[in-house]
């Protein structure tokens, strides 16, 4: 009996020793939740969150920097109840239940909001908000879940915007990227405010204050965006906006706030890069080359953008009433092939050829029923010879195509196949060359892609790739047609399937601009330059241009750049050539280049061949004018550009590049 008692005491002593583990050794966040002076406090070792339960206002104390968010406001919750849209306020919930919340890997608060009312009407809805510190860096993870009963959520602004006195500048992936000082003298607006459009190529933004920074990273971006304001002289207000999906907020929405004691827009971009790598979204060019050797031929190659037939329908806003000859301009396939042969004689040994206007009635006409190839230009035989010429010259031949614009005179047009909006209407426009059009539901696009490219290959046309217009620049669509419903998430899946089909057929996949969702599906884009006022076609830059996109994805996708001054997406009075160099992108090449253009193209190609597969590790401004800048790549290569003096320096220097004419 005595021996048994000794043994039992030994076991108890051993268990006590083994369970006395330091909290820091478990990986469990060392975070405490408590109430203090009427506020809820979430305290970690680095960061402290204060929540005022009366107005849901939050303040974050992050290692010496305070980030204050605005309070709940009227309209931060929009619902539909009995067919009416109602503006509510989260903080006006008749009942707020706030309790500590701990999952073992994140710790904070759960806030359950119920008993909403609008005038004398009770709104049957529950909103649950979660605020937690997570991970060693104690990032603030905010999650919103709606339990919709008789009322549905149309949009919600939460967490609220960071107050203007908490930051000096705002960082936005507005096209390639924008740094916007709070007191910027000119009005700034985003072209669109939904994720995956030009306003937000990538689903994040951030703010800088002195040497500190905060990143707002949307982890569920498909039905999300922002509200953005910057009047003349500022200040800037940028706020997260959650959007319904087919009329409901039907899945949890999550955003992560990352705090940097010492950091700026480069650190934000690198944190986001780590995020897309961790979730498997980042697909490098090296991986794409491994999957398709044709992609390797694009590294260090110029991009030749040319066309066959430009035909403008009378209904189009581009129609030339006073000069009808401009409405139908044709160059044959054979003529274009000869121009490529002459270009090759100037020393161009490889290139990516993007061909517009090859379809039956030319550029932006009759989609998705574009076959047969333009009869006036040579038809099937002419297109086949053009493709063979590209093969012989070592050029990668790809066609321009479109599977969103749905022309009313297309052979397959049926109004029942268009997008149906929530209010029961169908989109209609007549801007583009083909005239009257609607929008094809994304669920139906893949069948047309298969139809057309299978036919091209069956006719012996050696097309090596395709550019599917607008897919990677227009935010995702919704469709409410019960025959082919599609959420925004569905839309992106269907667009991706179209691009993946091209790659499965051995082709290079391309689209218009580099919206983040498309990175795993495409190899290059038409361009990814900067936001200008009043539009990207021409004008001064909005804010200060910075290469946010390339800081994340330079080694995942190829971006071509126009060379001229004030070209599309290039700030007026600045050389596209210098922007192309500092971004180490591909150059555009005209069909009849002079010596200066050829020299510029060869320099850009040589630089891209050196670093095109490498990460852009750094971007920096070298003086207060923001005109002298430097980028650094993973091998140590630096590119320094002075936009004022129109000079550049590449270090280490590129090998001597001589004329090959």
Name what the model sees in each region:
Residues 44, 246-268, 316, 321-324, ...:
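Active-site-proximal substrate-binding groove within the catalytic cores of carbohydrate-active enzymes
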Residues 18-23:
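Boundary at the C-terminal end of the N-terminal hydrophobic targeting segment
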Residues 33-34, 40-353, 358, 365, ...:
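Carbohydrate-recognition beta-sandwich/jelly-roll modules
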Residues 6-13:
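Bacterial N-terminal signal peptides
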Residues 25-30:
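Short, Gly/Pro- and small/polar-rich lid/capping loops
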Residues 1-4:
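Positively charged n-region of N-terminal signal peptides that target proteins for export
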Residues 296, 301-448, 459-466, 470-484:
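Aromatic-lined carbohydrate-binding/catalytic grooves of carbohydrate-active enzymes
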């Amino acid at each position: 009996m005595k021996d048994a008692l000794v043994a039992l005491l030994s076991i108890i002593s051993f268990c006590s020793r083994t369970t006395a583990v330091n909290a820091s050794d478990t990986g469990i966040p060392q975070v405490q939740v408590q109430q203090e002076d009427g506020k809820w406090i979430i305290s970690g070792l680095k960061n402290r969150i204060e929540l005022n339960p009366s107005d849901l206002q939050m303040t974050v104390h992050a290692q010496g920097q305070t980030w204050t968010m605005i309070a709940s406001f009227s309209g931060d919750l929009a619902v539909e109840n009995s067919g009416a849209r109602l503006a509510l306020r989260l903080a006006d919930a008749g009942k707020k239940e706030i309790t500590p919340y701990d999952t073992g890997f994140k710790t904070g608060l759960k806030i359950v909001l119920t008993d909403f009312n609008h005038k004398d009407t009770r709104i049957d809805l529950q909103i649950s908000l979660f605020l937690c510190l997570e991970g060693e860096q104690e990032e603030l993870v905010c999650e919103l879940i709606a339990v919709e009963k008789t009322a549905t959520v149309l949009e919600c602004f939460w967490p609220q915007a960071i107050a203007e006195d908490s930051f000096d500048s705002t960082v936005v992936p507005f096209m390639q990227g924008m740094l916007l000082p709070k007191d910027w003298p000119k009005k700034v607006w985003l072209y669109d405010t939904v994720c995956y459009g030009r306003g937000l190529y990538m689903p994040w933004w951030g703010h800088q204050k002195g040497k500190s920074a905060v990143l707002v990273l949307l982890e569920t971006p498909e039905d999300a965006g922002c509200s953005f304001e910057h009047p003349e002289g500022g200040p800037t207000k940028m706020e997260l906006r959650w959007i319904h999906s087919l009329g409901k907020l039907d899945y949890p929405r999550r955003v992560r706030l990352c705090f940097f004691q010492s950091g700026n827009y480069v650190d934000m971009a690198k944190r986001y890069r780590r995020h897309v790598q961790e979730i498997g979204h980042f697909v490098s060019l090296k991986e794409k080359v491994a999957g398709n050797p044709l992609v390797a031929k694009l590294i260090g190659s110029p991009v030749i953008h040319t066309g066959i037939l430009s035909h403008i329908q009378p209904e189009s806003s581009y129609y030339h009433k006073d000069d009808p000859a401009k409405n139908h301009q044709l160059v044959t396939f054979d003529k274009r092939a000869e121009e490529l042969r002459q270009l090759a004689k100037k020393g161009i040994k490889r290139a990516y050829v993007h061909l517009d206007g090859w379809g039956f009635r030319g550029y932006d006409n009759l989609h998705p029923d574009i076959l047969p190839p333009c009869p006036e230009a040579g038809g099937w035989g002419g297109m086949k010879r053009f493709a063979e010429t590209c093969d012989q010259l070592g050029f990668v031949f790809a066609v321009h195509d479109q599977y969103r614009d749905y022309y009313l005179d297309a052979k397959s047009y049926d109004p029942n196949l268009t997008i149906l909006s929530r209010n029961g209407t169908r989109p209609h426009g007549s801007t583009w060359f083909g005239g009257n059009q609607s929008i094809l539901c994304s669920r139906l696009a893949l069948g047309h892609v298969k139809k057309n490219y299978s036919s091209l290959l069956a006719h012996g046309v050696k097309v090596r790739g395709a550019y599917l217009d607008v897919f990677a620049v227009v935010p995702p669509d919704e469709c409410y047609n019960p025959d082919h419903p599609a959420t925004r998430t569905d839309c992106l899946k269907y667009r991706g399937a179209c691009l993946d089909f091209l790659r499965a057929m051995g082709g290079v996949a391309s689209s218009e601009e580099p919206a983040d969702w498309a990175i795993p599906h495409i190899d290059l884009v038409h361009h990814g330059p900067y936001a200008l006022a009043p539009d990207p076609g021409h004008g001064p830059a909005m804010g200060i241009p910075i290469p946010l996109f390339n800081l994340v994805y330079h080694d995942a996708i190829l971006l071509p750049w126009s060379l001229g001054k004030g070209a599309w997406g290039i700030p007026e009075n600045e050389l596209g050539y210098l922007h192309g160099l500092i971004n180490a992108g591909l150059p555009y090449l005209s069909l009849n280049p002079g010596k200066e253009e050829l020299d510029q193209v060869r320099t850009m190609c040589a630089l891209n061949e050196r670093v095109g597969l490498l990460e852009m590790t750094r971007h920096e401004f070298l003086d207060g004018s923001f005109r002298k800048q430097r980028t650094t790549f993973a091998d140590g290569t630096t590119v320094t550009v002075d936009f004022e003096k129109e000079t550049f320096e590449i270090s280490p220097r590129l090998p001597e590049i001589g004329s090959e004419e």
